[in-house]
């Protein structure tokens, strides 16, 4: 078995106070010769409005085609949790998460959908990806319906 160089998996770890202090970790991809899609879903993501300090809520869907590295899922959970006390606009949170994953894991491709619940009566959906999906990659729909409220 490949030795893993991770600091959080299997340990009791307190979430970082901010995303900039959080540690996102990677592990070797044993299937790096295959192009495939991995998906993380965070249906209860929270952050703070940078102006009012009120909580914001989102359903995040992160799709990526790993290269040589995988995102270690406990570190991702802790990284996402670090946004709970972080004030940032929806667009910034969504793109920041995608860019951090790209920085650490260097995937073949990544897209993130941030489906934010309404604040001020307006739901905001934010989408970012690194470019076209690799040829032949099966990319299923993210499965999150547009916000309809009671309509």
Curated annotation (Swiss-Prot):
Share an example GO biological-process annotation for this protein: queuosine biosynthetic process
Q: Where is the active site?
A: 49, 56
Catalytic reaction(s) noted: 7-aminomethyl-7-carbaguanine + 2 NADP(+) = 7-cyano-7-deazaguanine + 2 NADPH + 3 H(+)
Q: According to the UniProt record, what class of enzyme is this?
A: oxidoreductase
- List positions binding substrate: 71-73, 90-91
Q: Where is it localised? A: Cytoplasm
Q: Which InterPro entries match?
A: GTP-CH-I_C/QueF, NADPH_dep_7-cyano-7-deazaG_red, QueF, QueF_type1
The record's annotation in Pfam families points to: QueF (PF14489)
What keyword terms does UniProt attach to this protein?
Cytoplasm, NADP, Oxidoreductase, Queuosine biosynthesis
A GO molecular-function annotation:
preQ1 synthase activity
Q: Name one GO cellular component term.
A: cytoplasm
Which Enzyme Commission number(s) are on file for it? 1.7.1.13
Report the pathway entry: tRNA modification; tRNA-queuosine biosynthesis
SUPFAM superfamilies recorded for this chain? Answer: Tetrahydrobiopterin biosynthesis enzymes-like
Where is the major localization of this protein?
Answer: cytoplasm
From the UniProt annotation, give the residues forming the signal peptide.
Answer: none
Top-level division of the source organism's lineage: Bacteria
Q: What biological function has been recorded for the protein in this entry?
A: Catalyzes the NADPH-dependent reduction of 7-cyano-7-deazaguanine (preQ0) to 7-aminomethyl-7-deazaguanine (preQ1).
Q: Provide the family line.
A: Belongs to the GTP cyclohydrolase I family. QueF type 1 subfamily.
PANTHER family linked: NADPH-DEPENDENT 7-CYANO-7-DEAZAGUANINE REDUCTASE (PTHR34354:SF1)
Return the protein name.
NADPH-dependent 7-cyano-7-deazaguanine reductase
Originating species? Caulobacter sp. (strain K31)
Q: What is the lineage of its organism?
A: Bacteria, Pseudomonadati, Pseudomonadota, Alphaproteobacteria, Caulobacterales
